[in-house]
Structure formats: C-alpha cells, structure tokens
Amino acid sequence: PRGYPLLYVGQGINQVSGEAVRLGYHIFSLIDGKELYFINGRDKFAYIGWGAFDGNPLIDSKNDTMILPGENGLVYVTKLNTNYDTVNGNITIKPNVTRYRYTKNGYAGGMENSIAIYNNSAFFINNNGILQALDLNTLSPLWSYNMEDDCDATLGLEEENNTIMLYAACEVDKRGTVAPAFAKKIDGKTGQVIWEYSCICQYDANVNGGALSSPIIGKNDISNLVIFNFSKTTNLRTGKMVALDKANGNVVWKKDLSFYSWSSPVACYTKEGKSY
C-alpha cells in the first residue's frame, strides 16, 4: 500500500521442514529483504497460546497504521512510524503497538479471517463464531453476535441506505457430522440479523465443510446479489455456489459443484457493467 516497499507476512504454522520455528507476523523491506519487525504470536497478553496469523491486515495509509487480528485472540493496532527515503533507497519503521483482547461469556476465541473496517468500526469473527464490532478510537466493543460455529471467511461489507451491511458465513465444525452452514446479512451498526440462509454441509476433521471463503458482493448488473461458496454439501467432495438476493436472502440461482471449492469466488465486469 501507498507505494512503500513493505511486505506483510503472517504464519499459519510453527514448523519448517519438520523443525520448530518462532510463530508470528513479519514485516519485511522489499529493498533488501531484511525483516524490519516481528510480532511474536505467543503473546503473554493473549488469552490463547496459539500464535498464528491467517488473515491479512488493513493498512490505514493516512494514519500510517496497521490493524491486524490474530489467532491468539488479539487485535493489534500498530502505528508504524514509517520513514521512506526515496533518494537513498532506505525504509525504516518504528512500530508503536496497542493490543485489544476480550472474552465472551468467559471464553476467548482466535481470529482466522481478515479484518473488515468502515470508518472507525472494525468487524471480525473468531473461531467460536462470535462476530464482533469494535470501536477503533476507544478499543471498546460496540456489539457482538453468535454465528453458531467457527468462521474463517472474511466478512463482506457494503454501504446500504445510510448504514453498513455485513455478509457473514460459518463452517460446520463444532455441531456434529452434518449441520447447516449459515450465511447471514447483518446490520453493521446494530448487529441485527436481516436474513439468514442455511446450507446442509458435512464435517471433516481435516478441512471443515461449510463456507470457508468470502462472498461476492455484486455490482452493476448483479448489484442485487451476494454469492457464497459452500463446501462438502451432499458428501465430502461436493460443493454448491449460491446467489442470494441481498434484499431478502432468497435463492436467485444455485450451482451444484462436483468438487467443492473453498476459495472465494470472483466477479469480473466489462466496461458496460456485464458480469461474469
């Protein structure tokens, strides 16, 4: 972002070629490849001992700040204090880190999705299924909602009628071998559920069924649609792509997949606004 030669990299595991390595988040200079900063995921401030970072951060270019959720249950708000010397080809950072932690009914949860932000409000879901809205000015919670299961998929976010709408979906992980995976539209200002859609999916200990990826929030000729991918539907191999009406959650079309997909679908548009 901003044209700065910085690379932001999170780890999902703590082993390389079978050998244990430190686990956390890295910032590298793309000028010389040197590591400029490391966040130790095994943070003593965290309620959770696992220190992976599966999601991407959001870089606030105006305020030179990185906002990053971790699987240790912390949200890191880091003022980078970047100094980029374009004449001599040097870049440095002096991070100042603030951390937010929380529990819900006595339980902590880690975040495996990327953070979604609108103005001063951040939105994320933990692996207990707790969707939370966070005030970034005060680092205090605004509201929370239980999605009923683990959520790896990053939220979709869209402005609508002077409010913020969130599109969220969960997996089938903690509720038995066969259960509904939910896709929901939620008012980002209040946490109120507008509608929900369910798709029966299978549990698999290796790769969970359900929604593991972000939806398409349609534009142009599909501006009325939000499109989700569900994995492991009728069995452990199959999947389903479903287009839902943004207004009411009704199915507009669906496509059964012979093999499931847990990547995010992508919409492409012509200059005339035709979608593919």
Residue ranges and their predicted role:
Residues Y4, D32, K62-N63, N72, ...:
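Acidic/polar residues in short coil/turn loops that connect beta-strands
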Residues P1-Y4, G10-Q15, E19, Y37-I59, ...:
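Extracytoplasmic beta-rich repeat domains
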Residues L6-V9, T65-L68, S121-F124, Q132, ...:
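Conserved beta-propeller blade signature
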Residues L30-D32, L80-N83, D135-L139, D187-T190, ...:
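Short loop/turn segments that connect beta-strands within beta-propeller blades
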Residues S29, A116, S121-F123, D187-G188, ...:
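Beta-propeller-forming repeat regions
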Residues V16-R22, E71, F124-N127, K174-P180, ...:
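Short, solvent-exposed loop/turn segments at conserved positions within beta-propeller repeat blades
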